[in-house]
């Protein structure tokens, strides 16, 4: 199982890049250590793939344009296709560890245009308001779906027949989810553009022009809306202001460049639109409690390999500072 502590996005986009994802078998399983992400947060992003997840330990909050939901250890759920979302670890005294399946809906539809797709898959993908489906261990029916979810993560990827066994259990999980939300299936989105659809080009423009000085007047004009509508869309979808979103994106991008490149701190600051190295350093210290140089050294000096402990949970052989 791939162990991750950062999210990889396509350049100039908030769409997640999925390493190892192939048309022959469009699936990726991973273990996400939320406490080791910058700000203990997976930033806003989306993917066409469906996201099935299980909280192994700790707790985290899923944010979508429709709101937020807390998931504790033993719970799980599904993020629907193309839904904008982010996650943040919650302090519980235990490390926040999440197991994730990312897969294309075709993995469970079978024949294109067939009964399974038309009756169970497409209606769920298109259902109005189904951004996020939660699974609670306290609900007996949902607990059965959670048991299947745990079973899916226990499968050995090296075993002959793994793909067949995984597909079979994913289909059973999907059946459980479809029954759970059956009353909402068949509700299609309205023809008018929703706030969730409006926010994506706004985000894309910010990422494409991150190194520049950005004003709401400029940003609103770029997507042909009023400043008032621009603020309202950010509040409705991301639950924050444009300015705070830009600041967080710049700091997240700076962390990535410090970890993955040898660029000078001044160049990192320039590429992220964070001004002079002194201003960048002050903003970085305020957010992370260390300077950009200290962050880079702590990261580079960390042993970021992983091993599994006796309980089967990935454990760090060193400490990753974030």
Set out the residue ranges of the language-model regions:
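Generic protein-terminus/edge-of-domain signal
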Residues: 1-76, 82-86, 118, 129, ...
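A hydrophobic/aromatic-rich effector-binding and dimerization subdomain
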Residues: 2-33, 81-153
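Residue-level marker of regulatory loop/turn positions in helix-turn-helix DNA-binding domains and
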Residues: 31, 44, 191-195, 208, ...
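Short histidine-centered beta-strand/loop micro-motifs
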Residues: 40-46, 88-90, 111-113, 162-164
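Structural motif
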Residues: 76, 96-98, 209
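An amphipathic alpha-helical interaction segment
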Residues: 117, 123-190, 194-197, 201
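Basic/polar phosphate-binding segments, predominantly the helix-turn-helix DNA-binding elements
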Residues: 176-183, 201-251, 259, 263, ...
């Amino acid at each position: 199982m791939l162990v991750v502590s950062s999210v990889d996005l396509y350049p100039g986009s908030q769409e997640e890049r999925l390493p190892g994802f192939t048309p022959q078998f469009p699936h990726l399983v991973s273990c996400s250590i939320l406490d080791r992400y910058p700000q203990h947060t997976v930033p806003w992003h989306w993917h066409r793939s469906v996201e099935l997840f299980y909280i192994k330990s700790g707790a985290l909050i899923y944010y979508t344009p429709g709101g937020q939901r807390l998931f504790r250890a033993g719970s799980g759920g599904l993020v629907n296709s193309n839904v904008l979302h982010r996650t943040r670890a919650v302090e519980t005294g235990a490390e926040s560890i999440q197991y994730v399946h990312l897969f294309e809906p075709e993995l469970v539809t079978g024949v294109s245009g067939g009964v399974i797709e038309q009756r169970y898959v497409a209606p769920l993908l298109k259902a109005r308001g189904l951004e996020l489906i939660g699974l609670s261990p306290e609900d007996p029916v949902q607990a059965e779906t959670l048991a299947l979810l745990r079973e899916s993560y226990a499968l050995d990827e090296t075993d002959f027949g793994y793909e067949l066994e995984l597909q079979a259990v994913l289909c059973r999980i999907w059946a459980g989810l479809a029954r759970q939300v059956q009353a909402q299936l068949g509700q299609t989105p309205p023809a008018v553009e929703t706030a969730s659809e409006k926010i994506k080009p706004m985000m894309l423009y910010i990422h494409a022009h991150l190194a520049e000085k950005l004003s709401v007047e400029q940003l609103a004009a770029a997507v042909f809306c009023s400043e008032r509508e621009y603020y309202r869309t950010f509040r409705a979808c991301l639950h924050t202001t444009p300015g705070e979103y830009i600041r967080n994106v710049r700091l997240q991008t700076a962390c990535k460049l410090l970890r993955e490149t040898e660029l000078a701190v001044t160049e990192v600051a320039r590429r992220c639109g964070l001004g002079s190295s002194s201003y960048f350093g002050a903003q970085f210290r305020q957010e992370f409690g260390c300077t950009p140089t200290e962050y880079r050294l702590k990261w580079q000096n960390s042993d970021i390999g992983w091993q599994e402990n006796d309980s089967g949970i990935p454990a760090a052989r060193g400490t990753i500072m974030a």
